[in-house]
């Protein structure tokens, strides 16, 4: 099966990108830092809220595309713990926009067999938002298609702190002898327990930082950074990121296959191969 059988291209560029994609080598989990809504609006002399509304349209297209490509998991960074520092009017608008999105898009999400999950300190969100999130997760709980994970009131360091506190609670309840602290134990107590770690981390707006997002989980993720601001991140740009991902040789801290063969032939111990190269791809569009 070709990816073009899963997704009908809207134009020639999309058709060419789909031809390059191998449906058997798509990532299991794509995580996205959706950055640039405010700058998008400012460049057009519009209020920041206009950028956030445009960003919702981009998110809708990315969600639909990933679901049609049968990606198992997509995580979107929607609202960080630090975002509370923004002007009160902007924060209130973002909360209303989230509720509008859930009410409007939930039937489509459900129809496409997508399961909605929310990670973060949701107990600190407004009551109405919490209720709408709980209803949406309940209605999609039995869906077996793509998992759409929305990071709300989320921070990577806070997630690790919450995981460590959960492990301490486990020790208090069951005793230290029944617990072993290792990487798997930490993963099992994260908000994302049971989900695969991201294979591909996409960041828009050209910023070269991870912004306290999935700090534990992205240890071996491939990074794709594009200059596009989030509202301009189209389906073609997503396909471009997936094509780039499939060109990568994932090393997980080791040597590339070619270097590994050379080191073995020369009797080298390969110690330098423990330094993992980060791949930062820039798309100079826009």
Language-model regions, residue ranges each:
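Flexible, compositionally biased loop and terminal segments
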Residues: 1-286
């Amino acid at each position: 099966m070709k990816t073009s059988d899963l997704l009908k291209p809207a134009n020639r560029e999309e058709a060419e990108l789909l031809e390059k994609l191998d449906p058997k080598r798509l990532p299991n989990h794509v995580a996205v830092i959706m950055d640039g809504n405010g700058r998008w609006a400012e460049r057009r002399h519009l209020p920041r809220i206009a950028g956030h509304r445009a960003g919702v349209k981009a998110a809708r297209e990315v969600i639909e595309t990933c679901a049609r490509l049968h990606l198992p998991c997509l995580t979107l960074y929607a609202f960080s713990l630090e975002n509370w520092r923004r002007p009160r009017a902007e924060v209130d608008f973002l909360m209303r926009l989230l509720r509008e999105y859930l009410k409007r898009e939930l039937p489509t999400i459900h129809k496409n067999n997508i399961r909605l999950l929310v990670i973060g300190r949701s107990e600190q969100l407004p009551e109405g938002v919490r209720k709408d999130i709980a209803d949406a997760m309940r209605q999609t709980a039995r869906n077996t298609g793509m998992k759409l994970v929305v990071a709300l009131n989320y921070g990577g360091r806070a997630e690790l702190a919450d995981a460590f506190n959960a492990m301490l609670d486990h020790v208090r309840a069951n005793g230290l002898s029944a617990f072993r602290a290792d990487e798997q134990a930490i993963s099992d107590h994260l908000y994302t327990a049971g989900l695969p770690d991201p294979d591909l981390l996409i960041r828009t707006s050209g910023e070269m930082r991870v912004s306290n997002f999935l700090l534990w989980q992205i240890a071996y993720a491939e990074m794709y950074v594009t200059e596009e601001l989030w509202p301009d991140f189209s389906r073609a740009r997503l396909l471009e990121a997936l094509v780039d991902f499939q060109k990568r040789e994932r090393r997980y801290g080791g040597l590339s296959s070619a270097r590994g063969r050379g080191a073995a032939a020369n009797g080298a111990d390969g110690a330098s191969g423990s330094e993992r190269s980060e791949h930062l791809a820039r798309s100079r569009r826009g």
